[in-house]
Amino acid sequence: MLQSEIDISSCDLCPRVCGVDRGAGARGVCGADGRLRIARAALHFWEEPPISGTHGSGTVFFSWCPLRCVYCQNAVIADGEAGAEISIGRLSQIYSELQAKGALNINLVTPTHYAPHARAALDLARERGMGLPVVWNTSGYETVRAVRENRGYADVYLTDYKYASSDLAARYSKAPNYPQVALDALSAMVDEVGDPCFDEYEGDERMTRGVVVRHLMLPGALEDSKRVVQTVWEHFGSSVLLSIMNQYTPVLAESAKAGDAWACRELERCPELARRVPNEDYERLLDFADSLGIEDYFWQEGGAAEESFIPAFDLEGVLSE
C-alpha cells in the first residue's frame, strides 16, 4: 500500500477526532500531516522484562503525538522536532532489520496517528517472513474502534493509564475525557488479546499476548495514582500486568532553564512539575498496591528517574542502511 492510498481525509484515528484532511497536507491536533515520520528504530532495553529481555525490544518511535502531555519525557518527538519522513515500504524493511538484529518483538511507540501506515508495513514485512510479536505501545488515548482495527496486528498492548482524574487530564494533557476513554480502550484491548501469555525466545521469557498497563507517577499526584491502581485492579484484576513507574524526569523545568518560552509559561502554570517524585510517595503507592492484594506487578528501584531512560532521537535505524 502506498501512503497516497491511506484515507485520512477527515482524520478520526484518535479520540481528538479533529477531522482535518491530513492527506492533503493539513496537520491534525497530533501535529502530523499525511507523511510518515519516524525518529528512531533500534533495540531498546528499558521496557518491562518480558518486553525487552536481555536482547532488546525492536522499538520504532513515531514522531508527533495525539496526547501531547505538558511533561512529556519524549517531547522532542512528540513535538515533531526529531524524525525523518519515510515510505511504508521503508518502514516494513525496518521491521525486518530489527528482527535480524535479534529483537524480541516489534515495539511501535505512539503509533496511533499512523496506525494505517504501521499496519500496511506489517503486512509487507510479514510477506517477507517477519514473524515477531507486535507490541502496540500507546498513551492509552485510543478509540475502541482503533483497538478493534488492530486485530491481527497487535499481539501485546503496552498501554498507559495516566490519570483517574479528569481535572489532571485536562491540566496536563488537555484531555478531560482521558480517564473514561482510556478505560474503554483498555477493556477493548483485554478483549482483543486476552490474558498474558509468554514463551521463551533465545533464553528470554517473552510476552507474546496480553496487556501491560503502565502508570507513571507524577509529582504531587499520589492520591490520583492510588485511584489509577485501584481502578485497574478492580476492573481487570490479573487479566493485565500492572507496571508502576518511578521514572518521571522534570524535562519541562530543564527546558525552561534553557530559556524555552513555552516551557517557562507551562512551568509557571504547573510549578509542581519542576520536581521529581519523592521516593517516600512512590513507596506509599507500592504499599497501597500491596494492600489491595496485587501480588504480581512491575516496579522500579528508588531513584529510577534518569535521562538514561530517554533515548537519543538521532534517526538511528530510520534511513536505509
Regions found by a protein language model. Name each.
Residues 31-152, 156-157, 165-166:
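Conserved Radical SAM active-site core
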Residues 58, 106, 134-136, 157-159, ...:
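Hydrophobic faces of well-ordered beta-strands that scaffold small-molecule active sites
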Residues 78, 115, 140-143, 161-179, ...:
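Conserved radical SAM core fold
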Residues 91, 118, 147, 182, ...:
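Aromatic/hydrophobic pocket-lining residues that form the small-molecule binding cavity
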